Amino acid sequence: AGCKFAVLTATHETGFGLWQSDVNPYCLKAVKWKDGKGDIVRVFVNSCRKYGLQPGIYIGIRWNSLLGIHNFKAEGEGEFARNRQAWYKRLCENMVTELCTRYGDLYMIWFDGGADDPRGDGPNVEPIVNKYQPNCLFYHNIDRADFRWGGSETGTVGYPCWSTFPAPCSHHKRIESNVDQIELLKHGDKDGKYWVPAMADTPLRGANGRHEWFWEPDDENNIYPLNELMDKYEKSVGRNATLILGLTPDPNGLIPTGDEQRLKEFGTEINRRFSSPLAQISGQKKSLTLKLDKKQPVNYCIIQENIQNGERIRQYKVEAKVNGKWQTVCSGESVGHKRIEKFDPVEATALRLTVLQSIALPDIINFSAFSVN
């Protein structure tokens, strides 16, 4: 499918760990598989590197059904409960230390539901990640999120979608209490001071009203059809976000054949649509004209900014030259890393991008045209 990174759920709500933990006995040491010496995290990380994927780890510490932890909170009252709470915080910190120190550089560490507030019931994991994985993406606690959830588990984000945010994470004290948090997550804030780009997550088995993050038998008919995946791609990647697909390994630890086949089809279709532009141009200016080698049908264009310089474009329009005259085919606001515009097919000899509003000189690294059947 053209994925750049993969993230393994190393531990989830049961508390069971998929590695050889020295601090959490409820792990692969407790099973008969490989005589209790297996390490799925290591196998996963090694496989990612073998096949050119960046490895990440997803850590669930918000819930632990074995230990009776609910929303970071140990059950009970009084001194005994307070001692259990302190012990659980240390356990979580030690598990994070193990995962940060045993597997080399990690691309991302993702805490399910966040890692909470270390000044309260949450473990103090951010200093551990900073010390042992200083270059990884951190997601997230009450103080910091290197990217943000896009406001739904539909694999889409709203438009416009800005990578900037008014605070270093959602639900931060710097965000005014009357702000709609979900809308803010979906759209970001064009004037925000923090770079917190959006991600759009959804399970691959999410069709027909299902929403399966974990494997279920006889569930292959709920894999998203290709046309729905492409729609999600255009409404996530094409709106300046990252698309994250949840995959469900079966009891043998394998991605089922049907899921694998759909991912291959997905990657093939992305390449079919967008790997061969009719023409392409770049430049640091407010207007770019893309000349085609002949009159031909056009129904898509892609615009990309050099995000090393931030998001400068605030409003734009795209025109097509049809029978010698310019006519507007689409317009928008946010661009960022990538904006995919689909419009009614026109027979054109050129496309023209005009930036109508910007906060600095636009730095456009890609303006390209496509004809997609």
Spell out what each predicted region is.
Residues 1-320, 328-343, 354-363:
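Mature catalytic domains of secreted/periplasmic carbohydrate-active enzymes
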